[in-house]
Amino acid sequence: MTPDIRPLVAGNWKMNGTRASLDQIKAMAEGVKGDLSARVDALICPPATLLYVATALCDDSPLMIGAQDCHQKQSGAHTGEVSAEMVADCFGTHVIVGHSERRTDHGEGDALVRAKTEAAHGADLVAIVCVGETEEERKAGRTLDILKRQLSESLPDQATAENTVIAYEPVWAIGTGLTPTVSDVEEAHAFMRRELVSRFGAEGGKMRILYGGSVKPSNAKELMGVANVDGALIGGASLKADDFLAIYRAYEELTA
């Protein structure tokens, strides 16, 4: 954790979830409440097909709803795409950009991630910008070089602590059950903090840096207690309300 930074626990449902899954979001909305919700933010990013209904379920809850991606353009002949304005029109508050699965499956590079981040900001959304190294890059000792490049090229100059969140996701840890050591996570997050402060000054010191990569109830408290880890971006464990809320409630002791 970073003193004076409000943590964010975010769930990315990826290509999972139909209307039958809305009961999980309802349970999450009911579980995110009380004193903890005044200290820790919670967010779920379901498929775009569920955005509007999900936000309606959270009308009386602090649980926020966001999108998993957006197009870099406001509108136009881009079949199958969803713009940041459309996300905002569904009352979404955040959008994930640059997730490793987008970078790998769709060949999205840093320049495109930067354009999507700018589009999110233009729609008054908070951009969750994902960065992280592959297994090959890690074995070659290039983790910090990759993070430096991705932060430099994916973040626009107008990024602030209010409109931008960083998510560190070691690609080799996503969906594999593998997790970096606490010291590895601490080193990566400390490095990113220094890079953000170097570029953005005091504003960079206030930006939230989430950890993502096989986060689950059993390791959440340990990971989220690491210096400069300001929350989590959760994959599979966010599909079930019990698991998501267990991770969220790990902050009961951490923020007490």
UniProtKB/Swiss-Prot annotation:
Subcellular localization(s) per the UniProt record: Cytoplasm
InterPro entries in UniProt: Aldolase_TIM, TIM_sf, TrioseP_Isoase_bac/euk, Triosephosphate_isomerase, Triosephosphate_isomerase_AS
SUPFAM superfamilies in alphabetical order: Triosephosphate isomerase (TIM)
Main location: cytoplasm
Enzyme Commission number(s) from the entry: 5.3.1.1
Pfam assignment, any one: TIM
A GO CC term assigned to this protein in UniProt: cytosol
Pathway: Carbohydrate biosynthesis; gluconeogenesis; Carbohydrate degradation; glycolysis; D-glyceraldehyde 3-phosphate from glycerone phosphate: step 1/1
Highest taxon listed in the record's lineage: Bacteria
A single BP term in Gene Ontology: glycerol catabolic process
General function of this protein: Involved in the gluconeogenesis. Catalyzes stereospecifically the conversion of dihydroxyacetone phosphate (DHAP) to D-glyceraldehyde-3-phosphate (G3P).
Assembly: Homodimer.
Family from the record: Belongs to the triosephosphate isomerase family.
Name of the protein: Triosephosphate isomerase
Organism of origin: Rhizobium meliloti (strain 1021) (Ensifer meliloti)
Upper taxonomic lineage: Bacteria, Pseudomonadati, Pseudomonadota, Alphaproteobacteria, Hyphomicrobiales
